[in-house]
């Protein structure tokens, strides 16, 4: 994939603006996400493992909000070679980088689209993945998006959903900041990134996430990952 760098976006004092998934973010995103989400590599591995127990020959899969394709590439390791993945993101910088990688690696079973998932028509799919994306969707649009995903899934299909949630205890927030500090982020960088995300990332409680999934019609919602406030569920149609 294109060259990546260590995340130092918020290292220096600055007039903080709203967080954007632009080229500056895309250039450091792999480093940023692994240093920000505890056990992120384990989450990617497990979603691939779980999807592999569902996906059959010729099935279709979506990775909605794919960024640089971490989930897509994990899926590819565990699904049949005849399955097809459509990876979607609204960030031109993310799409350009991931599409260049897919084409360079001749991964013909992966299609990379630049689109707004709120408005994108979804075709029938066995598995849909959405990792840390719903939290960036305007809250009034979330119910309709989950309902659309439910309708697109085949009977018995699954949504693999991961989100940062409101902490049940303030200790979790303290521990998460300690984790980021252990990854080399300064107190200034942590504070400035928090400020940048304040208006664009609206997190909810785990209960709210579950209620939305159940209201859409999912018959079972099972947890499969937790790293402090970062949680993931399998929602089964």
From Swiss-Prot:
It comes from Dichelobacter nodosus (strain VCS1703A). Belongs to the class I-like SAM-binding methyltransferase superfamily. Cx-SAM synthase family. This is Carboxy-S-adenosyl-L-methionine synthase. GO terms for molecular function: carboxyl- or carbamoyltransferase activity; S-adenosyl-L-methionine binding. It comes from the Bacteria. S-adenosyl-L-methionine binds at residues 40, 65-67, 116-117, 131, 194. It catalyses: prephenate + S-adenosyl-L-methionine = carboxy-S-adenosyl-L-methionine + 3-phenylpyruvate + H2O. Its EC number is 2.1.3.-. It is an enzyme of class 2 (transferase).
């Amino acid at each position: 994939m294109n060259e990546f760098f260590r995340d130092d976006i918020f290292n220096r004092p600055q007039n903080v603006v709203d967080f954007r998934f632009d080229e500056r973010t895309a250039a450091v995103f792999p480093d940023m996400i692994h240093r920000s989400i505890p056990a992120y590599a384990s989450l990617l591995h497990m979603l691939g493992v779980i999807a592999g127990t569902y996906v059959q020959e010729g099935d279709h899969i979506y990775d909605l909000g794919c960024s640089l394709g971490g989930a897509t590439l994990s899926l590819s390791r565990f699904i049949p070679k005849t399955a097809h993945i459509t990876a979607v993101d609204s960030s031109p910088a993310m799409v350009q980088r991931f599409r260049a990688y897919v084409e360079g690696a001749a991964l013909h079973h992966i299609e990379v689209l630049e689109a707004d998932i709120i408005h994108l028509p979804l075709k029938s799919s066995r598995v849909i993945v959405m990792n840390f994306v719903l939290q960036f969707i305007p809250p009034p649009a979330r119910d309709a998006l989950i309902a659309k995903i439910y309708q697109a899934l085949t009977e018995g299909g699954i949504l693999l959903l991961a989100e940062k949630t409101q902490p049940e205890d303030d200790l979790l927030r303290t521990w998460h900041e300690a984790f980021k500090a252990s990854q080399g982020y300064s107190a200034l960088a942590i504070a400035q990134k928090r400020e940048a995300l304040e208006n664009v990332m609206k997190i909810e409680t785990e209960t709210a996430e579950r209620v939305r999934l159940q209201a859409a019609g999912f018959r079972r919602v099972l947890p499969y990952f937790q790293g402090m406030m970062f949680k993931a569920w399998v929602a089964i149609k």
